[in-house]
Amino acid sequence: MAKAKFERNKPHVNVGTIGHVDHGKTTLTAAIATVAAKTFGGEAKDYAAIDSAPEEKARGITINTSHIEYDTADRHYAHVDCPGHADYVKNMITGAAQMDGAILVVSATDGPMPQTREHILLSRQVGVPYIMVFMNKCDMVDDEELLELVEMEVRELLSDYDFPGDDTPIIKGSALEALNGKDGKYGEPAVIELLQTLDTYIPEPERDIDKPFLMPIEDVFSISGRGTVVTGRVESGIVKVGDEIEIVGIRDTQKTTCTGVEMFRKLLDEGRAGENCGVLLRGTKREDVQRGQVLAKPGSITPHTKFDAEVYVLSKEEGGRHTPFLNGYRPQFYFRTTDVTGAISLQEGTEMVMPGDNVEMSVELIHPIAMDKGLRFAIREGGRTVGAGVVANVKD
């Protein structure tokens, strides 16, 4: 049989299931795959295939995740589901599976539980922009008032973490009934409603190429008679010959102009998101630029030394530290292409951080780095990774 050609004609959106253990995330993931395949075509993965999440490495950290894909009438979705709570924490902090929106699964029989809260907090910290809710196991609750109570609790919890709790879509259903092909209101119709809500509630994500130009600098060369060339992979946007650009981070921000773009020794008119290229800078001296800075569209990103972060500390089994660290700990923070030393302050009431924990902290770097909320980094000690983090807030 001929292999189906992957068609890129629908917008691509990344989503995932979050929520407390045993509330039905994996069953719902399997039900979505099954119902989507039945309704909109495509191939369904069964529960066992999703549950046996393969290991993958992200920034040197082992994470178990399942990836499935499905289509609706208007979109193509990539959906991530994690088996264990620790996998969620690692996944969200490292950004291994970036989510344009999340489906929070809450069991109607339990209501919100500790990990429900923690996953909402994590979503807020790492910048998941939209959360919608699937209230699962509704077939096991006879009392309509109980369902309303759970819904109210979920809305309040979302509002506590600055999500629009009152306006969040909440779909009531039973993932198991839907998976078994039942067509009562909690079965397949509930999952079809969920798919329609995904299409309407999560806006189409902005593509990297449409964002402002940004290129982390990896290397700097001087070419006699032509000037200084910096190389790197364009992270977002487009740079054209003649564009004004800024060099941001580590030192004072400098303005310069792109006088040439080259790729594989060929001269081009522009460099685009995803491409590795060299950018020729007008009037910039070799010693004025260094690895760890970024080239950016003027005014689009600013340098900061202080920020708040959500951090996952590797366990010793993952090659991390064997001992906890305390307030004032000074490791290296690896942003994009370079290490910068920084000092950490833990939140009041937190004395120390154990390997394997995730924690909120404030950091002060010795040099400013071009950063925005959502930027990922690694924490290193003597060249080995001991933690992974994400900028939750920039200060100054």
Swiss-Prot record:
Origin species: Psychrobacter sp. (strain PRwf-1)
Reaction(s) the record says it catalyses: GTP + H2O = GDP + phosphate + H(+)
SS bond partners: none
Keywords: Cytoplasm, Elongation factor, GTP-binding, Hydrolase, Magnesium, Metal-binding, Nucleotide-binding, Protein biosynthesis
Family affiliation: Belongs to the TRAFAC class translation factor GTPase superfamily. Classic translation factor GTPase family. EF-Tu/EF-1A subfamily.
Pfam families the record matches: GTP_EFTU (PF00009), GTP_EFTU_D2 (PF03144), GTP_EFTU_D3 (PF03143)
GO molecular function: GTP binding; GTPase activity; guanosine tetraphosphate binding; translation elongation factor activity
Protein localization: Cytoplasm
Main location as per UniProt: cytoplasm
EC number: 3.6.5.3
Gene of this entry: tuf1
Taxonomic path: Bacteria, Pseudomonadati, Pseudomonadota, Gammaproteobacteria, Moraxellales
Cell wall biogenesis/degradation among keywords: no
Domain of life: Bacteria
Residues that, per the record, bind GTP: 19-26, 81-85, 136-139
Protein name: Elongation factor Tu 1
Quaternary structure and interacting proteins, as annotated: Monomer.
Region (G3): 81-84
Stretches the record annotates as G2: 60-64
Function: GTP hydrolase that promotes the GTP-dependent binding of aminoacyl-tRNA to the A-site of ribosomes during protein biosynthesis.
Region (G5): 174-176
Statement: the UniProt record of this protein carries the keyword Cell membrane: no
